[in-house]
Amino acid sequence: MKKRLKIKNILILINILFLLGCCIFYGSRMIHYYRIENPKIEDVKTLVELVTLGKNLTDNGDGLYHENDIYYYKGKNVNNYLLYSGRLFRIVSIDKSGYMKLITEELQTSMVWGYNQEFENSYVRNWLNDDTDSYKSFLHSLDNTQGLLVNTNTCVDETDGKTITCDKNYESTVGLLSVYEYNLAGASDSYLNIGSYWWTSNKDSDGNAWYVYKKGTVNNDSSSGYTYYSYGVRPTITINGKISNFKGTGTKEDPYEIIFDKGKNLNDQYVGEYILFNDIVWRIQETEEKYVKLASSDGIKDKDYILAKYGPKNMYSADYGIGNYLNVTFYNSLKDKDSILLGVFNNGKYDRTNKYDLSKINEYTVTCNIGLLQIGDLFINDVEKYYLATRTLTSDNSIYQVLEDGKIYIGNLKEEMKIRPTLHVKPDLKIVSGSGTKDDPYKLG
């Protein structure tokens, strides 16, 4: 009896030791893999490591997916916001090298795609990458690009809207998003659907460029006869994600932010940031050695919006019409005139008669204190229902207008619309406070 009891106790002890060993083994494995998937934040050295943490991944619903060595975001509610060089971007995808493709959250301008051209020869590609005498490129507006930006692969496959592939790529510093990538993210049910019209990088067999409609569907009616439509431009760039100078969590309220040291002069700040000047909030358009170009962040107000007709003709002038109001009435209402510089503003023509060539837009200019924006300027879509200074060759009684959803139309001079001024100021004005956002603009001292 005692012998049986002894054997029983030994078996119980063996079982206990076995169970204890299993708990230790599998518990340690669980801790090991948990640490791999969820490293301490202080162990995360680079932006790409933080973004691709295991806890951020999903295989259903909204979130970050990982397939075939590519990470990509899908769905509406995703924390993929990134702030760089004064612009808010969304992270689209990450490749196996740690390169992160970004797209601007907002439209950066609106323009005609091109004149029966492939993306690589289009006006949009030129505006994205190449400076001219008529306009500064989107690339020109970015700071601290050295060592951060890498070339972007833009998918340029021809598509009929049903068979959508991404086999043919064009390499440039700045590109556009493809229909393929738009669909991969969830199309109209994704974070990429911002309720505006904007170009993709693809064309159909008839030479029509595809664009995203305001409801999120993809369309290709980009022209009618000899008339070509202007839609919004959302540039894509690719950054090296193996950087350590960052902060943030990727939410809209606390985006990932790439951090660089900046000076205190106005021209040390980023294009796209906001400044309070003469009690008006302005957005920085250009930062140059000799001047900084600003555009009001909204139409001029006196409690309500001040509305005005363009004038008796579409030539912009300080002597009559909207130009006279801006350079006399509005200018004289400003307290700090000493900081304003004379500026050269384009008042050129843009339509089918010159094949919508944006480089022709500086064939007529006007020098004055206060001007209007033109097609191809940054952030022209921030405000709706106002006049641009861009004319047409076909009629002296028409002028371009910015309407809703990122669309540009040729309108009548006699319509009453908002007034959105632009001006040049001294570059060495000092920043004393503010964070440069629209709600907390920089203040000058």
Describe the function of each predicted region.
Residues G27-G445:
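Collagenous Gly-X-Y triple-helix signature in extracellular proteins
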Residues F18-M30:
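Hydrophobic alpha-helical membrane-insertion segments, chiefly the h-region
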Residues K2-F18:
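N-terminal Sec-pathway targeting helices
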